[in-house]
From Swiss-Prot:
Native source species: Delftia acidovorans (strain DSM 14801 / SPH-1)
Record protein name field: Putative phosphoenolpyruvate synthase regulatory protein
Keywords: Kinase, Nucleotide-binding, Serine/threonine-protein kinase, Transferase
Superkingdom: Bacteria
E.C. designation(s): 2.7.11.33, 2.7.4.28
Residues noted as binding ADP in the record, renumbered to the chain: G153, V154, S155, R156, S157, G158, K159, T160
Keyword Kinase in record: yes
Coiled coil: none
GO molecular function, one term: phosphotransferase activity, phosphate group as acceptor
Amino acid sequence: MHTHTIFVISDGTGITAETFGTAIMAQFDTKSRLVRIPFVDTMDKVHQAVRQINHVAESESHKPIVFTTLVNQDMLDLIESQCKGKVFDMFGTFVRPLELELGQKSLHRVGRFADISESKEYLERMEAINYTLAHDDGQTHQDLTGADVILVGVSRSGKTPTSLYLAMQFGLKVANYPLIPEDFERKQLPPALVPSRKKLFGLTIDPQRLSSIRNERRPDSKYASLVNCRYEVAEAESMMRRSGIPWLSSTTKSIEEIATTILQEVLPQHLGH
């Protein structure tokens, strides 16, 4: 398997270029090492990036691959003319053809988050993250009616990372609540969740996978035993069926896939539907 160094160069955080570049490289059977160089907003920083790329090009057997979202044309020209990597100009690939199609020049705004820190969208996103952190793992029952969605499931089924992803990526207020043995004995949802039943979405997981995850945290405990994990998962799924709660298994799905399914099922308007 070939090994390539992938550089991601941006005048902002580099998140856009990294996400896009990673998705493209996933189509190839090649092992890669990713180097993100964010906030390249001066010519000095461009020269530093070029030196870093060229050093790798001279020390490795394969030419580095460079994904860039630089907006400044002079900086981009310097990268393309002086670096010894294969450069892919992501903005140029899409923005310049769009300028022709739309009949107008792009705004050439530098950085994904330029002038966003005081915007309504940004402030709402920060509020959503704070809400989600405060309502993680059933920490509080207060203001559950303010949640956009409430995730339920057994402990370690993926509720917390999914909640934070939905908050950070979509600005959603997400509470998550663990289903525990006491709930299974009562055969009922936790009382605090009943008024918000329509906002509930369940996560389940393969018992063997759950046991493996729990053993990393509390090895050789009843909590992590396969017998207990089978019991909890079966009871949780039964409870979700009885309560009419939509749910999915997180066993083989990425957080992005889980989040998108939740949006489709519960909040389709956030997908533009």
